Amino acid sequence: MWSYAVHGAVWLVLYLLFILAPLFVLLAGTLPPARDFWTEFAVALGYSGLAMMGLQFGLTARFRFVTRPWGEDVIYHFHRQISLIAVGLVFAHPLIIFAAQPELLARPEDGSVPLGALAAVASIGALALLVVTALWRVRLKIGYELWHASHIVLALVAVGGGIVHMVGWSFYLEDPRKRALWIGLVALWIALLLYVRVVKPLFMLRRPYRIAEVRAERGDTTTLVMRPDGHAGFRFSPGQFGWLTLWGSPFKITGHPFSFSPSAEAAGGRVEMSIRNLGDFTSAIHQVPVGQRVYLDGS
């Protein structure tokens, strides 16, 4: 228990360092001309919000050594809550700047709009759609697959737009150390995205499972019994959940999260998932044929 607490504390400190690093670096090196307090405060909120948004790729990468101290359900709850905080910071950024410098709302005489401004509008618009669809997906009757795909696209637009906006204005990027920090952060975010969408599916492709049994349960629930195909499987903790890719390759954008239902000590690497029919994807679970190849991400 003590080792888990230390492990968790270390990751929490590292997370805070990544979030606060842009603010610390703002004070280092060559400083641009000073501006009023509210403008600088708004810029600090924008930098922090962008850093938090980028690190969401890490929270959703499902690294076992990161999720182990808390559990994946806690990590995803944290992802949801911290995302709302990041969105609040990003939304506050332009509101405070325009309140402090209303002249910025005036359009240039030649009618052109700077690329940084267009990128900011795209980023904030994507964030607004992302929040609305995440909080009210069920009420809006958006299917899980469509929501998950759009969630990824909107997140990429939001973060990408924020980066272009930052580079477009580049007020604090003249100093080499500041540029180096943001180049490093962006490279980290891209690496995390590639890990989730390329590297991890490659590992899953080499470690498939086969449906060994499809068992009907009470309450319109079906249990899928799966056994590793050509490998020893993986160990999981009681209550842990994994992502099931049932029809398609592990490179498919959407995996469906379900809890593992058997004991973590099940023989032969066997895993089971008891899935209740809630419509959409789950309505066809009982039709899965024995012997079908599936992919599990439980790491």
Task: Indicate residue ranges for each PLM-predicted region.
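Intrinsically disordered, low-complexity segments enriched in polar/charged residues with Gly/Pro
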Residues: 37-39, 44, 60-62, 132-134, ...
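Short, structured interface segments
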Residues: 186-198, 292-298
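Hydrophobic alpha-helical transmembrane segments in integral membrane proteins
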Residues: 170, 174, 193-210
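Membrane-embedded alpha-helical bundles of multi-pass integral membrane proteins
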Residues: 2-194
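A generic short-segment signal for beta-strand/edge and adjacent turn/coil regions
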Residues: 20-22, 35-36, 56, 125-127, ...
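Detector for methionine-enriched segments
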Residues: 1, 52-53, 166, 204, ...
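Ferredoxin-reductase
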Residues: 203-297
